[in-house]
């Protein structure tokens, strides 16, 4: 069995949903091409690519486009892995430089140890000098982001950092070649509601995992956005967020607008199958989402119980050691909704998912 490669800490990664989503897809033999509209780190897209599907990865975040280029669009069999290893070795050999990343994220805040920040500054500048095309650039940037994530001092969100240095933050930054996958796919950076009106008619299933409350992934992971853009933006607050985090908001993050924009998205989709995941902390209830999907075909759903992300369990602290906010609950539900033209297939797929959840079985491609 081949498990997904390790990835960055990401509150929206759906790591625990991967086996359930893979299992659902495997019960639908007529599904060959899938679009992931809100791809994030591309964890779901990677799992589906491993299933032999052609995947179209989309997200508005620039860092997601980099992950999509690396893991979804790139065919591992067409890449010169030895050249990439040489480039990574050259980047690791660069002398440290005290630049924007060190000053902003290591000295003015404490996301990373300064000795690692100086390596990041040097490597980020080196990537733009050494990469000869967008694929190489994306792979090298992915390696840098994943390396930085392994030595950070957060609970997985970049809204704050730990009151004391994490143990991993003392480890030296180490670039590794990303675990590329065979096969090609597509990647876009577009508004999801615009993209669905342009999607290839051959897309068989659209996976929808929209932002579900007021928290923006753009601001939750502002450091990765800055790593990719390399634009040294002005920042604000203890978290040193990009200034444009104040204005870069999705309609899905607004309680007043989310219902309208989500309904518009669903109405515009023409694929025969829809697979929607939604968190119980979101704006919509299970019944409300079922009603929205009802006109698209037969609908079945399952609720899966999971622990909340680690920051919600231990709390987040500011530089003075004071806890920011309070812990309200430790568990929530991820709802999976499948919509399709055949009632028996839809119900069988969701029924099998419910059984796997109850027996703690997993279904990953390659087993």
Which positions does each model-derived feature cover?
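Conserved proline-anchored active-site loop of SAM-dependent methyltransferases
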Residues: 21, 34-48, 57-62, 201-220, ...
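C-terminal catalytic and target-recognition region of SAM-dependent MTase-like enzymes
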Residues: 285-288, 292-362
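SAM-dependent nucleic-acid methyltransferase catalytic core
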Residues: 2-3, 39, 97-98, 102-220, ...
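S-adenosyl-L-methionine
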Residues: 1-38, 43-51, 65-67, 74, ...
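A short, conserved alpha-helix within the catalytic core of class I
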Residues: 216-223, 257-262
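Conserved phosphoryl-transfer catalytic core
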Residues: 63, 68-122
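Conserved Class I SAM-dependent methyltransferase catalytic core
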Residues: 249-296, 300
């Amino acid at each position: 069995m081949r498990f997904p490669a390790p990835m960055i800490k990401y509150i929206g990664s759906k790591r625990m949903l991967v086996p359930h989503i893979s299992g659902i897809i495997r019960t639908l033999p007529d599904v060959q091409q899938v679009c992931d509209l809100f791809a994030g780190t591309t964890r779901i897209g990677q799992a589906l690519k491993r299933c032999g599907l052609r995947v179209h990865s989309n997200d508005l975040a620039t860092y997601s486009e980099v992950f999509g280029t690396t893991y979804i669009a790139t065919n591992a069999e067409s890449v010169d892995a030895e050249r990439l290893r040489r480039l990574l070795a050259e980047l690791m050999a660069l002398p440290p430089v005290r630049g924007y990343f060190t000053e902003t994220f290591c000295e003015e805040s404490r996301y990373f140890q300064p000795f690692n920040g100086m390596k990041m500054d040097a490597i980020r500048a080196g990537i733009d000098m050494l990469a000869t095309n967008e694929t190489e650039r994306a792979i090298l940037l992915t390696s840098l982001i994943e390396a930085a994530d392994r030595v950070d001092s957060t609970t997985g969100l970049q809204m704050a950092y730990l009151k004391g240095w994490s143990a991993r933050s003392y480890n030296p930054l180490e670039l590794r070649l990303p675990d590329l996958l065979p096969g090609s796919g597509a990647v876009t950076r577009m508004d999801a509601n615009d993209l669905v009106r342009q999607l290839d008619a051959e897309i068989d299933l659209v996976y929808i995992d929209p932002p579900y409350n007021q928290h923006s992934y753009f601001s939750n992971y502002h450091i990765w956005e800055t790593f990719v853009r390399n634009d040294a933006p002005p920042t604000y607050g203890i978290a040193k967020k990009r200034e444009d985090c104040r204005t870069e908001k999705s309609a899905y993050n607004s309680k007043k607008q989310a219902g309208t924009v989500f309904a518009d998205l669903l109405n515009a989709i023409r694929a025969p199958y829809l697979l929607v995941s939604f968190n119980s902390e979101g704006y919509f209830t299970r019944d409300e989402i079922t009603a929205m999907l009802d006109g698209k075909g037969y609908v079945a759903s399952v609720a899966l119980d999971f622990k909340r992300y680690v920051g919600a369990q231990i709390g987040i602290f500011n530089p003075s050691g004071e806890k920011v906010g309070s812990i309200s609950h430790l568990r929530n539900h991820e709802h999976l909704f499948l919509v399709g033209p055949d009632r028996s297939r839809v119900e069988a797929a969701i029924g099998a998912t419910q059984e796997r959840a109850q027996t703690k079985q997993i279904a990953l491609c390659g087993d």
